[in-house]
Amino acid sequence: MPDPAKPGKDLTAWKKKKQPVHRTVSQICPPPRRPLTVVDIRTGMENERLGVVRDSMFQNPLIVKAELGKPRERSCSLPGINFNYGLYIRGLDGGVPEAIGHWNVFKQQPTCPHELTRNYIAMNRGAVKAGLVTARENMLYRELNDIRINDQEDRRQKEPPPIPPNMTFGIRSRPSTPFFDLLQHRYQQLWVQEQKATQQAIKMEKKQKVILGKLYETRSSQLRKYKPPVKLDALWHMPHFKKVASHLATFPTEADRQRALKAHKEEYAVRQGTLRMGNYTHP
């Protein structure tokens, strides 16, 4: 006898499994939205109009309305298929055959001709040699003998400066490290010798100096430097305060006062601290 629970399992086995949905590139990255046209308008849309309708009316951003549930249409039309985005280089428009076949040489553009300036120095020199002095004679001479300054004459070819035969171009290479001098402490020995020579020169310079004898002070030199002492006057006090004693005397005698000061100094350490109970270091 078949189990009554098996028919339910058999029915579920006949159900087809859902295949995974593969999206195309156009679905993942849809093409850019183009501006609306009259053909795209259907009944019930927001941009449906009555009367004469032209495509240019749907390219005006002030007139076009946003459709329900869709992004707003832009009225900017895209260029055609043959349009290249970016910089177009005309020198490389032939591709690989043109690059391999010949060199791309740009022709020099012809310079625009300009009027040459007059050479007044040469014309004045010629007029003086011809004996012309007045302004009218000079003007007529310049009309007959119009001398111009050539641009090629101003461009003097400067010769390069003479280069010495032992000239080295570029950065000179670092000389090789003298390992033998480093191992022998040659630089240390040279430094010690220089220090000794410097000390010897200082000693010789001190010996060459004339050592003067001790100068003794005489009575005349002492009188020359003597300054008489200035007697300072005592400070002035008011006469009726001279013999006034202290107003308050708490000690009967001076001995008692000194004894109290001594006891105060002995108790000075005990009366220190935040609570005036002394400073002590507890173990």
Curated annotation (Swiss-Prot):
One GO process term, biological-process aspect: flagellated sperm motility
Domain of life of the native organism: Eukaryota
Keyword Endoplasmic reticulum listed: no
Gene (UniProt): Cfap77
Keywords of this entry: Cell projection, Cilium, Cytoplasm, Cytoskeleton, Flagellum
Main localization, broad class: cytoplasm
Subunit structure and binding partners: Microtubule inner protein component of sperm flagellar doublet microtubules.
InterPro entries in the cross-refs: CFAP77 (IPR029147)
Name under which the protein is recorded: Cilia- and flagella-associated protein 77
GO cellular component: axonemal B tubule inner sheath; sperm flagellum
Compartmental location: Cytoplasm, Cytoskeleton, Cilium axoneme; Cytoplasm, Cytoskeleton, Flagellum axoneme
Family per record: Belongs to the CFAP77 family.
Region (Disordered): 151-170
Keyword Metal-binding: no
Free-text function comment from the UniProt entry: Microtubule inner protein (MIP) part of the dynein-decorated doublet microtubules (DMTs) in cilia axoneme, which is required for motile cilia beating.
